[in-house]
Amino acid sequence: MKLIAVLLLVVLATATTATAADADALQDLCVADYASVILVNGFACKPASNVTAEDFFSNLLVKQGATNNTFGSLVTGANVQRIPGLNTLGVSMARIDYAPGGLNPPHTHPRATEMVFVLEGQLDVGFITTTNQLIAKTIAKGETFVFPKGLVHFQKNNGWEPATVIAGFNSQLPGTVNIPLTLFNATPPVPDNVLTKAFQIGTKEVQKIKSKFAPKK
């Protein structure tokens, strides 16, 4: 009985560890087959005979992103949806460009920890813990900062020049929950009475905020 109990504990511990990040690959590669209708916590593998170097290559992060938008920033993702060779490998990247004063608004990555490296500029960055503690710092060219998995975080260009970072994730598809857009531009919309109660503001204020995120006609 003791041996069985120990074995059960080992199995449970292993299962818990396995779910802490993307599952380990069980083969050398599993290039995503975008044409397959089968989706089991990832993409199906395309035949090994059809795999080429292009499946593992991308120039997505070469060009600066257009930052002439509401927040003054643009995230260019290099994840499994853009690079099929990342399937099952548990990593991805992104380039984030910021106009002067630009903001990557408060958001979370439900499936990954993020680490950023500043290519150009200076940024105010931070994350908020589950006890509502703000952990923040100003980072400059050549410096790095880590945002723990699932915690709300942000980056803001505090300078007069454009800024750029490269971000790394321990997931092939980290996912992004943009807090302002999630709450005020969801489809179907979050009920006004939920937002008025949550933010202790009136319906007119909620409608005004929603109008700022509505698609431009």
Curated annotation (Swiss-Prot):
Source organism superkingdom: Eukaryota
UniProt entry keywords in alphabetical sequence: Apoplast, Cell wall, Disulfide bond, Glycoprotein, Manganese, Metal-binding, Receptor, Secreted, Signal
Cupin type-1 domain ranges (all copies): 58-207
Pfam families the UniProt entry points to: Cupin_1
Chain residues that bind Mn(2+): H107, H109, E114, H153
Encoding gene per record: GER1
Species of origin: Pisum sativum
Function: Putative receptor for bacterial rhicadhesin, an attachment protein of rhizobiaceae.
Transmembrane region(s): none
Family per record: Belongs to the germin family.
Main location: secreted
Disulphide bridges: C30-C45
Protein name: Rhicadhesin receptor
Cleaved signal peptide residues: 1-20
